[in-house]
């Protein structure tokens, strides 16, 4: 019996974040592709209009851990809801995004928690 799209979607839906990460890496290696978002070239006139609009989605990026690594891991767990191992892996891999596509208030709150823990944070 052949595997259907629904079977695949059901299997992917049951995976944890770490399992999905491993799956993406396996796809990248097997097919020689990248899961990174492709940049779309903007029209010359659109660049000025885009700059005039206020940014509504922000990415909180852990730039440097600092001296209090344990405190930063606790802050990452609180912000993201990740398990201990996943949060430690994220902190060990800095610079890495902690939250992506969040509003300004959530980005500011996450930045404050991480900086209070001793980390250096960028919001983009």
From Swiss-Prot:
Keywords: Ribonucleoprotein, Ribosomal protein. Pfam families: Ribosomal_L12, Ribosomal_L12_N. Gene3D superfamilies: 3.30.1390.10, Single helix bin (1.20.5.710). One of its GO terms (molecular function) is mRNA binding. One of its GO terms (biological process) is translation. InterPro entries: Ribosomal_bL12, Ribosomal_bL12_C, Ribosomal_bL12_C/ClpS-like, Ribosomal_bL12_oligo, Ribosomal_bL12_oligo_N_sf. GO terms for cellular component: cytosolic large ribosomal subunit. It comes from the Bacteria. HAMAP family: Ribosomal_bL12 (MF_00368). Homodimer. Part of the ribosomal stalk of the 50S ribosomal subunit. Forms a multimeric L10(L12)X complex, where L10 forms an elongated spine to which 2 to 4 L12 dimers bind in a sequential fashion. Binds GTP-bound translation factors. Forms part of the ribosomal stalk which helps the ribosome interact with GTP-bound translation factors. Is thus essential for accurate translation. Belongs to the bacterial ribosomal protein bL12 family. PANTHER family: 39S RIBOSOMAL PROTEIN L12, LARGE RIBOSOMAL SUBUNIT PROTEIN BL12M. This is Large ribosomal subunit protein bL12. The lineage of its organism: Bacteria, Pseudomonadati, Pseudomonadota, Betaproteobacteria, Burkholderiales. The gene is rplL.
